[in-house]
């Protein structure tokens, strides 16, 4: 049964008024809580004829995220289209500079512009404006609108909205940037690395159910990061088993070293690149 009911609350009304003014819109859905919640809200508010949703298939997108989009689209009755944004044909993206996201989003929005007759919309929220987000420049270049930002919604507001929509699986979904963010700045983005990262993180999730996990490709080797509580609970046998799994997934990187550490946000990003 398709979910079509929406009950506006004092919390969601400002966002609804903004989206109603857009008329037809195309939403880029990554599989994360922000864009997925926005997609469900806009679709229930305006209907299938007014809202198109697009998901980019890419080695940088976890398989679980694509499956999540497909499942939600079926449950909600979305008008969903899968596309290849072509970022892997862009050498500027593959070089993995500090502003890699600019090139990724440029390719995405160029692709969406060719499909859309309405307004392009993203799931960017107000908290995102506090970070270094080169993708926002690409969005500005393509006249992409950010309804969460316009409504003053931060991440907590988005999670609250997901709960209001009866989507607890989204409200509890941890943040997870694209897989390319796990590769240290300056190391070329390779399909094999991203597939290995996805495999390792999926396996760790199934084995240890951590609150947070990142498999990072660094110049010094592979770094497995987990939230401190999960990491402290790993015994030597757990670490050995995990290391063996990592090496199996990264066979294309012979003699690589595997290390473990507590999760540190953005630790594959070399901020000094900004000064060069």
PLM regions: where:
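A short interface-forming secondary-structure element
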Residues: 219, 223-238
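Short, conserved beta-strand edge motifs with alternating hydrophobic and charged residues
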Residues: 120-123, 172, 178, 225
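A short, flexible beta-alpha/helix-coil linker loop
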Residues: 88-89, 184-186, 229-231
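ATP-dependent adenylation/nucleotidyltransferase module used to activate substrates
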Residues: 2-164, 222, 240-253, 264-276
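Residues at or immediately flanking beta-strands
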Residues: 212-214, 221, 257-259
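Solvent-exposed beta-strand sheet faces enriched in polar/charged residues
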Residues: 54, 216, 225, 259-261
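Short secondary-structure junctions
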Residues: 204-211, 249-257
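Mid-to-C-terminal catalytic subdomains of enzymes
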Residues: 149-215, 262
């Amino acid at each position: 049964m398709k979910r079509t009911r929406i009950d506006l609350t004092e919390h969601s009304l400002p966002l609804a008024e903004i989206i109603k003014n857009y008329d037809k819109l195309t939403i880029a859905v990554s599989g994360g809580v922000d864009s997925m919640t926005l997609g469900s809200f806009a679709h229930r508010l305006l209907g299938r004829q007014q809202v198109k949703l697009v998901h980019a298939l890419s080695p940088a997108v976890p398989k679980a995220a694509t499956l999540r989009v497909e499942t939600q689209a079926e449950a909600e009755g979305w008008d969903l289209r899968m596309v290849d944004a072509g970022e892997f044909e862009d050498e500027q993206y593959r070089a993995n500079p500090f502003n890699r996201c600019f090139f990724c989003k440029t390719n995405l929005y160029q692709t969406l512009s060719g499909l859309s007759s309405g307004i392009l919309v993203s799931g960017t929220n107000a908290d995102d404006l506090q970070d270094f987000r080169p993708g926002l420049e690409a969005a500005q270049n393509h006249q992409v609108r950010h309804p969460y930002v316009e409504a003053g919604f931060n991440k907590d507001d988005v999670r609250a909205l997901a709960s209001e929509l009866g989507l607890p699986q989204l409200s509890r979904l941890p943040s997870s940037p694209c897989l390319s963010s796990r590769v240290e700045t300056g190391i070329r983005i390779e399909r094999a690395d991203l597939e290995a990262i996805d495999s390792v993180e999926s396996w760790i999730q199934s084995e240890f159910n951590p609150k947070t996990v990142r498999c990072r490709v660094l110049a010094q080797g592979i770094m497995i990061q987990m939230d401190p509580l999960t990491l402290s609970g790993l015994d030597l046998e757990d670490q050995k088993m995990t290391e063996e799994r990592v090496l199996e997934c990264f066979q294309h990187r012979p003699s690589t070293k595997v290390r473990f550490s507590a999760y540190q946000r953005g630790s594959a990003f070399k901020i000094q690149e900004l000064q060069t």
